[in-house]
């Protein structure tokens, strides 16, 4: 026997499928601001490089272009998710657009790490002369811009207070791009100082190789997190256990239970229960009230003698 949920109005139906993060608009606005700052820096570097014929400035500008692209992808994902939040063509809302953008930016980070490592290894084998006097202020300026942008993209106070492991991955990806670049700038400053002071020509490529390893570590971490969300990996064994315990608190048997992410701070659950004396679905749904982050629940309740053919078919 299956007990269906009571019918809902269209407005309620749409509201139930808006699974955006609590700070969605704030994060979208700040991501666009940071993208604009990086774009302005990019233009300044390219114009300055062309005017002074400095390859270092032009190279730094092209490097900044990768960050601008990553930030535009992140900001566009916010805008699209918000614009289509009520579009019923998306069965479970648009909250996962941020995970998709985060995954794409993680791939860019990984490719960047590989290219950095290749260039650094080549320069370790055959060190090239570096204009330390010109390169130091460029690295320092890049670090200042990155620190400003990192501050702008910091999580909100409420998010930090909750230590939410299922926070906004799109923001995390943009933040990691800038954090990785800031780390590269710090390593570059140290290497350039060592090269200028002690003549260590190997310091610059060695710092580049270390930075590549750091960026690669960031990329792998982000790929795992975004990939898990996109592939509907169970996000929380603790929440799954709590749902199971609450649904079976009256002696019912939980035959099937699935939990997955819908968006930042939002989860969905599907459960199949078997009860000797089935109650209306709202009776069991009430047991799950108050569970933070559980935004969508689908329940199927069967009597003890229900035909197994009514169950799900897991291929």
For the regions a language model picked out, list residue spans one by one.
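Residue-level marker of regulatory loop/turn positions in helix-turn-helix DNA-binding domains and
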Residues: 25-29, 50
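Active-site alpha-helix of zinc metalloproteases
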Residues: 38, 55-59, 172-173
């Amino acid at each position: 026997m299956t007990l269906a949920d009571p019918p809902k109005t269209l407005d309620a139906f749409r509201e139930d499928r808006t699974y955006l993060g609590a700070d969605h608009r704030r994060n979208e606005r700040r991501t666009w601001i940071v993208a604009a700052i990086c774009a302005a820096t990019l233009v300044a570097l390219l114009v300055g490089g062309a005017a002074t014929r400095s390859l270092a400035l032009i190279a730094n500008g092209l490097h900044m272009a990768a960050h601008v692209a990553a930030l535009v992808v992140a900001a566009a994902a916010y805008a699209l998710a918000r614009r289509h939040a009520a579009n019923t063509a998306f069965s479970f809302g648009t909250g996962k657009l941020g995970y998709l953008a985060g995954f794409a930016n993680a791939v860019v980070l990984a490719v960047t790490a590989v290219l950095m490592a290749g260039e650094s290894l080549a320069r370790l084998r055959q060190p090239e002369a570096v204009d330390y006097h010109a390169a130091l202020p460029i690295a320092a300026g890049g670090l200042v811009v990155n620190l400003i942008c990192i501050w702008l993209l910091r999580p909100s106070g409420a998010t930090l207070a909750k230590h939410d492991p299922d926070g906004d991955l799109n923001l995390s990806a943009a933040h990691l791009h800038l954090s990785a670049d800031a780390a590269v700038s710090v390593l570059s400053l140290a290497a350039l100082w060592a090269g200028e002071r002690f003549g260590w020509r190997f310091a610059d490529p060695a710092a580049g190789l270390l930075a590549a390893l750091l960026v690669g570590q960031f990329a792998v971490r982000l790929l795992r997190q975004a990939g898990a969300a996109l592939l509907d990996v169970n996000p929380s064994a603790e929440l799954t256990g709590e749902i199971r315990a609450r649904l079976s608190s009256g002696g019912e048997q939980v035959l099937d239970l699935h939990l997955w992410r819908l968006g930042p701070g939002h989860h969905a659950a599907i459960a199949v229960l078997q009860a000797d004396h089935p109650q209306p679905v709202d009776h069991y749904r009430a047991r799950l009230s108050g569970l933070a982050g559980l935004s969508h629940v689908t329940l199927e309740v069967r009597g003890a003698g229900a035909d197994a053919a009514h169950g799900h078919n897991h291929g």
